[in-house]
Structures are given as structure tokens and as C-alpha cells.
Amino acid sequence: MVPVIALVGRPNVGKSTLFNRLTKSRDAIVAEYAGLTRDRQYGEAKWQGRTYIVIDTGGISGDEEGIDAKMAEQSLQAIEEADAVLFMVDSRAGLTAADQMIGEHLRKRNKRCFLVANKVDSVDPDIARAEFSPLGLGDALPIAAAHGRGISHMLEQALGIFPKDNADENAEGEEGGELAEGEEVVAEGQEPKRIPGPSEKEGIKIAIIGRPNVGKSTLVNRMLGEERVIVYDQAGTTRDSIYIPFERDEEKYTLIDTAGVRRRGKIFEAVEKFSVVKTLQAIQDANVVIFVMDAREGVVEHDLNLLGFVLETGRALVIALNKWDGMEQGEKDYVKTELERRLFFVDYADIHFISAKHGTGVGHLYKSVQAAFKSAITRWPTSRLTQILEDAVREHQPPMVNSRRIKLRYAHLGGANPPLIVIHGNQVDAVPKSYTRYLENTYRRVLKLVGTPIRIEYKGGDNPYEGKKNTLTDRQVNKKRRLMSHHKKAEKKRRDKKR
């Protein structure tokens, strides 16, 4: 399970700055899509090959009222469910009453907590450690989030408490590397062959996610139908999501449910308690995400936040618009227009209009799940990907840079789930985003991929002679001397004739 780290602290101690620094490598992917909100409180981050989730819990000062009090309540819930907490304090401002209140709360919860003293660029780190020692949370880890100082040491301490996972099944491979289990190889003129792997043995893992009260529990119960099995908690802490294995049409699946517990033999609908931690970890652990939205409410900001995280992780995606029944035709037309306008950045995902309560359209979700999973794990040979690249360049050439044409030479697969296509060429740093989008759409169309994002990475061509010196043999040196002597004599004769 991917660890979740919560950033905790009163307002203006630098949580957002640290969040942006930790997640910047992944934020760049989402930032390419206009219309996708940048104001997110959670993101995926990587450090030394390890993946983890960061949650910015927002500022807690202890005197919140109204909507701020509700936000503080959600922050405390995130703290409760996180694997570890980075408690941030401001070295310049010193110890405050709000710091003491938060510190007392963390001590009572017996959380894995690391005290982080930010803004030490103008304060002696030893003084900062002494200043915050009354909190009773150990020595403070000094950092300067704005400049990146102390971040590596902080992460070494925070992530060191978690066991290192085995190789990620979604890890990106190298050209010519061994085929991962469960993936397909497709060669020209051949039918794809399946290689049984762990994903097929336990079934496609499907995460049902969405805002509270959009019908996730109803959809899970409808998908399980009468073939439900005994519900059990995955080994771990009580905050873990529920993993429900089942079969349909001789295909194995595992539903990852974050909405609530059902009782065997009857449908038990409880008020859904939305958990950010459960949702984010379910996305990370899934092969395919079914994103449930309320058709009557349309697209709201929180939907975009969650979709942004799905896009970051590269998971295959199916969108389900629930509560479609009973809507007027004019309302349906408006919702479809809004989906096309606001969700264009995930236009690769199949959209289903369903009624989880009555079962309308639910059965069609499985076909999209299967297609998305297959698209996400298929592997293609270098020759095939290069041919598609050459055809795309022939049809629409990349732009000129400094009077020179960008050259894209060949492509190969760098990883699967999601497919990563590595393109080699010259001046690749100058390839515009619009042209990358053109290549993505071309690969998607030709390879007939659905439900999965495609990532393209460029690599510049290295000069094989750079840094090398041409060393002459003795024979070559003597020959060079004779030629130079001959040229000098010929030049002298030419000058003498002119006289």
C-alpha cells in the first residue's frame, strides 16, 4: 500500500510551499491541461524511486467558525487516517498557542509524527530545535521549503519507517527489457497473446470513487448483485478500504470500495463518509477507476480535483454519470454539453449514463473496464511505434526552431499502465505541447486505445564523438608531415613565379 503523509500546521507555516515542492514532478503532467484546477490539496510524489501520497490538510488555528470549522474537521480526519504526519512550524515566528494545541492533539493520537521547522534560512537550526522542544515531539527537522534545503533528510526520516515495496507492477520499463507478467506483446500480422500474471489471477482491481452521496455504495451493490461474497477487510489498519472479489461471465474482478460496509444477504445503505485517504490509496492500488458523478449536479470542482489525481497516477478510467433516470431531455443535453466542455482532458475515457438504483446501463461498465485494462497493459514493438511516428511526422511535420526542423527519429515503449512512449530525436526540448498532443492522439487512434492516458517522453540524440580526441598513429603523423612539407614547397614555388 502506498504510504500517505499528511502536512499539518497552523496557517502560513509553508505547507503549500512544501506540498508544491514534493509534488512538482507530477504536477507538471496535470498542468499541461487547461481547465483542470491547480488548487488541489493532495498529490502523488516520488523520492528515490519510492511513490507516496501527500495531503495538505489546510491551516488549523483552533478558532475556526462556520465553513472553516468544517474544513478543520476534515483536516483532523485526514490526520487520523494518514500513515505519518509532518507537523510544520515556523522558525521565524517561534512557538505559538496554535502549535501547542496541534502538538497536544497529535500526542494524544499517538501518530507517527515528525516535527518540521520551516524557514530556517534566517534562523540558527539549533535555536529552532530548542524553541520547539516543549512540544514533546522529538528534535525538529530543519528545512527551508522555499529553497529546498533539508528536504532530502526530512524525507529520509519520514519514509524510512515504511518497508520498501517490491517492484511496482506499473513501473516503467526500458527498451528491450523483459516482458512483465500480465502484459501483451503485439507484433505485426500476429494475434495478441495473453501471459497470465498476478492481475489476472486476482482479477482486474476496480476502484469505485467519487464525491459523497453520488451513489457509490448503490453501484457497488448493483455490480455485486446476487453473486456477492463475504465482505472482508484487507489486512492492515481499520482505515483500509474494503476489497471484494467476485466473478462475472467467468471473468474475475476485485472491487475496491471506500464508501461503506454492506451486510451479507441484504443491501445496507449507510450515509457515506468521504475519506480522502481511502480514495487516494484506492486509486493507487486499482487497475481501472470507475469515477461516479451525480448527473443532476453535473461537473463540480471536487470532481475535477479527483480526476486530476487519477490523471497523475495514470490509471485507466471509466466515467459513470449516475441518477440519469428521471431527468428531462433538456437537462440531459445540458449535462452532455458540460461534460464535453469541462472534461475534455480525459476525452479518452468512456462515459456511461446509468442508474445504479434501477440497474440501467450498469452492465455496460464491464465492457469498458475490460477494454481500458487491455489498452493499459498492451506492449508494442519498437518497429510498430516507429512506423506510427514516421507516418505522423510525414502527415504533419514538427515546427522549425532557429531555422532548423525538429527531427524525431524513432520511438519505443518505455512502460505500461499507462503506456509510456519514448521518442528519440534532435531539438526535442523545443517540441510544443500542441504537437505532443497531436502525437498522443495519433498513437491512440492507430493503436485503438481506449480508457487509458498515453504519456510521451522525449530523449535528445547524443553526439557519439563528443569529448573524444582523434589520436594519430606514428605512420599518420609522418604522412601528415610529408604533406605539410609538400604544401609549403608548392606554396613557395607559387610565390616565386609571381615575382
UniProtKB/Swiss-Prot annotation:
Keyword Nucleotide-binding tagged: yes
Annotated region (Disordered), positions in chain: 166-199, 459-499
- What SUPFAM superfamilies would the database entry show? P-loop containing nucleoside triphosphate hydrolases (SSF52540)
Disulphides: none
Taking every annotated instance into account, which residue ranges of this chain make up the domain EngA-type G?
3-166, 204-377
Specify the domain of life of the species encoding this protein.
Bacteria
Question: In what ranges is there compositional bias, type Acidic residues?
Answer: 168-186
Q: What is this protein called?
A: GTPase Der
Gene behind this protein: der
